[in-house]
Amino acid sequence: MALRTLASRKTLAAAALPLAAAAAARGVTTVALPDLPYDYGALEPAISGEIMRLHHQKHHATYVANYNKALEQLDAAVAKGDAPAIVHLQSAIKFNGGGHVNHSIFWNNLKPISEGGGDPPHAKLGWAIDEDFGSFEALVKKMSAEGAALQGSGWVWLALDKEAKKLSVETTANQDPLVTKGANLVPLLGIDVWEHAYYLQYKNVRPDYLSNIWKVMNWKYAGEVYENATA
């Protein structure tokens, strides 16, 4: 891990400590920005190091800070019995909490090519994909098409419906987490189609980003989530 990357993360973590400590004292559970399991430049050329650094240090860090702030405000509003404030804070909690949840999944969905990123799924997940979509290639085509067609900002997901015991492709708007589409849906893969995920490298050509991100997809992680969810 580059020293600059580590230093930046330590600074972010230190800045979050006073808020987290104050929240913990009152029993409020805050969240922290997770470290990435690879260096910012490790996904090049599919995703540039600059995009990964900004995406993690700025965008995800902001969701974490704003979510924790909203939790603090909610805690105070509940203590006062301030119903209008409690209702008002729900949108900030959903948006920023969803941003944290979604990005935490997204980082694990990616892996450097040198470490197996882009290797197709095998075993149970591979068989399930063939059964539910016809082929791995058909799934990639479907997810890429739905991600490209999504208006505005959002996410495209490969989900497991635990009740139906089938895989499905879902989209969510803005930072809505997959659970908003159904409590029975387990996210196996999530692709961020907000412009901040690709614009510095791919400009306004979202399909090119969606074509290249498969080269660094961590199917091993997705397979592990699938096997745990179906055990």
Swiss-Prot record:
Binds 1 Mn(2+) ion per subunit. Keywords: Manganese, Metal-binding, Mitochondrion, Oxidoreductase, Transit peptide. It holds the Pfam family Sod_Fe_N. The lineage of its organism: Eukaryota, Viridiplantae, Streptophyta, Embryophyta, Tracheophyta. This is Superoxide dismutase [Mn], mitochondrial. PROSITE patterns: SOD_MN. Destroys superoxide anion radicals which are normally produced within the cells and which are toxic to biological systems. Its main location: mitochondrion. It catalyses: 2 superoxide + 2 H(+) = H2O2 + O2. Mn(2+) binds at residues 55, 103, 192, 196. Homotetramer.
